[in-house]
Amino acid sequence: MLPTTVESLFAVAKEPLELPEKELLTLLWDQVERDINSAGFSISKPHSISVNDQAQHLLRFLEELPSHALPGLLYRIDVSESALFSSMEGFQPLVWSILQREAIKVTLRLRFS
């Protein structure tokens, strides 16, 4: 099942993160941008910071990305092998896998920085 809420994306945090949802979502998108930029691409900000808008914006970005560039981007984001296999089902599961991975990075940064 694909995550559709902030809570499901940040479920890796055993204890709730002490930040408002809007701030968590801003940190999540900042991490997405950081990884995409470090892979040599750029992505604009979504119209709103909601989880679904971020997912739709990332989906459009991936659909427009040249196919030869996708493996390098996924390597940079550090998407799991199982998520790569799910990408064969389409970009939608891959988008959520990317957002979940980025949420893990945000959680680790908040906990250990």
Annotate each PLM feature.
Residues 18, 22, 48, 88, ...:
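Conserved phosphate/pyrophosphate-binding and hydrolysis machinery centered on Walker-type P-loop NTPases
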